[in-house]
C-alpha cells in the first residue's frame, strides 16, 4: 500500500518544507519545482530529509516521484503550516497596493485588533512585539513562503492580515487556492508590459484575484476612477461578485479634498451619510487609497465610526510621499507614468506661489522599456526642473536608459546626472525658498541594483544627509 504524505514525512523525520535549496534547513522536505531538479544534490547535501519531484529520472529512496508536485506541495502545506489569520484582505492595482495594505493593518490596530500586512515593503506587524520575519524581493511571494508567514502570524495571535497581490503573482498562481474576505483594486495603468505584453493581459491577470481568490460571501472594493472601471464591473457582474466603488463616481463618493504640505481634509458620502476627516497623509490620490482601506475593515464587521476615527491617525508608508526632515523634499515610489503624473501634479498644486518644482528620477533596467520616454515627457511637462539619473539599471546600459527617458523631454529644463547620490546632492543644493523636490522611483528601497550587485542606497537617507550638509548642520 502506498504511504500517505503524512506517513512519508513521519518515516523520514521531516520537520519543515522548502522549495529553495539556498534557504533549506536540516530535515526539510525539498520540493523540486521546475528547475529545482537541478538542485536536488545541493538540497540533500544541506540536510534535506526528503525530496519531492515530478521528474522520474531522479528518484531514489530519498527522492520521491509524484505526478502533480504543486498539488502535493499544497497538501504538505496544510500538514505543516495549516494556520492563517481568520480574516484576510488582498489588494491588487498598478499603484497604491503598499499604502492600502499598510493602512488596513494600521486601522485594525487602531481599533484594538492584532493585524499585519505583507507586501513590497516587507512584513508589518501591529500589536505584537519582537516579531521578526522577512520576505524576498517579490511583491507577492510564493505560496509556500506566504503560508509559512501566515502560519507564524496566526500562531502569534494575528487575526487580521492584508497583503499585496501582484499581477505576476496572480498569473503564476502564487496564491495557490487561498480565499480572502475582501479583495481591493486600487488603480490600473501601464506597467509590466515586458511580462504581460498587452494591457488587456495585464488587466485580466489582476482580475484573477476576484474570480479565483475572493470567498463566495466576500466583497470587492474598486477605485471608481480606474479608466477601465466599466469593463471591471461588467466582469464582476458576470461572475456574480458583489462590489463597492470608491472615488469621485463611487458608492463611497469622494466629494472634496483640501490638500496642503501638512496633509489634507477629505469629504465623502457613504451609505447616504456625509463624512469628513483630516489626515497628515499628503496626496489627494491617497484619498481613494484611504477610503478603500476604511470600508475594507468595515466590511469585516467593524463599526464605521471607529474606522473613521482610526483613519485620522493612520500614518504614511515609508517611501510613499515621505517627507524628509520636515523639509519640502519628498521621496516617492512612483515608477510608472500614472504614479509619476499624480505625484508631480499633487506637489505642483500644493507648492507655494513662486516656488519651483523639481524632480529626480530614472527608470529600472530589464523592465518595461515602453514607459521610459513617456515618463520623461510627463516629468518635463509638469516639473520646472528635471534631473535624469540612474534607478536600478540591472544589466542594461544606464546611459541608454537615461537617453530613452530624455527622448521624451521636448523642453530644455533638464539635466543628466548619472550618479544618483550626486543627482540628489545637486537637486538639494539648488533648492530655494518655497521650492519642492521630488525624488521618485525607488521609495522605500535601501539598495541600488547595478549588474548582479545590490549596493546599499536609500533615497531618504541620502537626501537627509545632503540636506543637513547643505544647511551646515553636519
Curated annotation (Swiss-Prot):
GO CC annotation terms, alphabetical: cytoplasm
Compartment(s) where it occurs, according to its Swiss-Prot or TrEMBL record: Cytoplasm
The protein's enzyme class: ligase
EC number: 6.3.2.13
Species assigned in the record: Rickettsia bellii (strain RML369-C)
Locus of motif Meso-diaminopimelate recognition motif: 391-394
Gene Ontology MF: a single term: UDP-N-acetylmuramoylalanyl-D-glutamate-2,6-diaminopimelate ligase activity
In-chain residues carrying the UniProt-annotated modification N6-carboxylysine: 206
Sites where the protein binds meso-2,6-diaminopimelate: 367, 391-394, 441, 445
Keywords, alphabetical: ATP-binding, Cell cycle, Cell division, Cell shape, Cell wall biogenesis/degradation, Cytoplasm, Ligase, Magnesium, Nucleotide-binding, Peptidoglycan synthesis
Binding site for ATP: 93-99
Gene for this chain: murE
Family per record: Belongs to the MurCDEF family. MurE subfamily.
HAMAP family (alphabetical): MurE
Entry keyword Transcription regulation: no
Function: Catalyzes the addition of meso-diaminopimelic acid to the nucleotide precursor UDP-N-acetylmuramoyl-L-alanyl-D-glutamate (UMAG) in the biosynthesis of bacterial cell-wall peptidoglycan.
Protein's recorded name: UDP-N-acetylmuramoyl-L-alanyl-D-glutamate--2,6-diaminopimelate ligase
Amino acid at each position: 500500500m502506498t504511504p500517505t504524505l503524512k506517513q512519508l514525512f513521519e518515516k523520514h523525520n521531516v520537520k519543515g518544507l522548502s522549495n529553495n535549496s539556498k534557504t533549506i534547513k536540516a530535515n526539510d522536505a525539498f520540493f523540486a519545482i521546475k528547475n529545482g531538479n537541478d538542485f536536488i544534490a545541493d538540497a540533500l547535501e544541506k540536510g534535506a530529509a526528503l525530496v519531492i519531484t515530478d521528474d522520474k529520472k531522479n528518484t531514489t529512496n530519498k527522492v520521491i516521484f509524484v505526478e502533480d508536485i504543486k498539488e502535493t506541495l499544497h497538501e504538505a502545506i496544510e500538514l505543516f503550516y495549516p494556520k492563517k489569520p481568520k480574516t484576510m484582505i488582498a489588494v491588487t492595482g498598478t499603484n497604491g497596493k503598499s499604502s492600502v495594505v499598510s493602512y488596513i493593518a494600521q486601522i485594525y490596530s487602531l481599533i484594538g485588533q492584532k493585524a499585519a500586512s505583507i507586501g513590497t515593503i516587507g512584513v508589518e506587524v501591529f500589536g505584537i512585539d519582537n516579531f521578526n520575519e522577512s520576505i524576498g524581493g517579490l511583491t507577492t511571494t510564493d505560496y509556500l513562503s506566504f503560508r509559512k508567514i501566515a502560519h507564524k502570524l496566526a500562531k502569534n495571535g494575528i487575526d487580521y492580515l492584508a497583503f499585496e497581490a501582484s499581477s505576476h503573482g496572480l498569473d503564476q498562481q502564487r496564491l495557490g487556492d487561498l480565499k480572502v474576505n475582501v479583495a481591493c483594486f486600487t488603480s490600473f495603468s501601464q506597467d509590466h508590459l515586458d511580462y504581460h505584453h498587452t494591457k488587456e493581459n495585464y488587466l485580466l491577470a489582476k482580475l484573477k484575484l476576484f474570480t479565483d481568490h475572493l470567498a463566495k460571501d466576500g466583497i470587492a472594493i474598486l477605485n471608481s476612477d480606474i479608466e477601465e472601471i466599466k469593463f471591471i464591473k461588467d466582469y464582476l457582474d458576470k461572475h456574480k461578485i458583489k462590489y463597492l466603488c470608491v472615488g469621485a463616481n463611487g458608492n463611497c463618493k469622494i466629494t472634496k479634498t483640501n490638500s496642503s504640505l501638512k496633509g489634507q481634509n477629505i469629504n465623502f458620502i457613504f451609505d447616504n451619510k456625509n463624512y469628513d476627516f483630516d489626515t497628515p497623509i499628503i496626496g489627494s490620490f491617497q484619498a481613494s487609497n484611504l477610503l478603500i482601506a476604511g470600508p475594507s475593515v468595515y466590511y469585516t464587521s467593524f463599526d464605521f465610526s471607529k474606522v473613521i476615527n482610526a483613519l485620522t491617525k493612520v500614518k504614511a508608508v515609508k517611501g510613499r510621499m515621505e517627507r524628509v526632515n520636515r523639509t519640502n523634499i519628498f521621496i516617492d515610489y512612483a515608477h510608472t507614468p500614472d504614479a509619476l503624473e499624480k505625484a508631480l501634479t499633487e506637489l505642483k498644486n500644493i507648492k507655494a506661489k513662486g516656488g519651483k518644482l523639481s524632480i529626480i528620477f530614472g527608470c529600472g533596467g530589464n523592465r518595461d522599456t515602453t514607459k521610459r520616454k513617456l515618463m520623461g515627457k510627463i516629468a518635463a511637462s509638469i516639473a520646472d526642473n528635471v534631473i535624469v539619473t540612474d534607478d536600478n539599471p540591472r544589466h542594461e546600459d544606464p546611459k541608454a536608459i537615461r537617453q530613452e527617458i530624455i527622448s521624451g523631454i521636448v523642453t530644455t529644463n533638464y539635466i543628466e546626472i548619472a550618479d544618483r547620490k550626486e543627482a540628489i546632492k545637486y537637486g538639494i543644493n539648488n533648492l530655494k525658498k518655497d521650492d519642492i523636490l521630488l525624488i521618485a522611483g525607488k521609495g522605500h528601497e535601501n539598495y541600488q541594483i547595478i549588474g548582479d550587485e545590490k549596493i546599499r542606497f536609500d533615497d531618504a537617507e541620502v537626501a537627509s544627509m545632503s540636506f543637513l550638509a547643505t544647511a551646515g548642520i553636519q
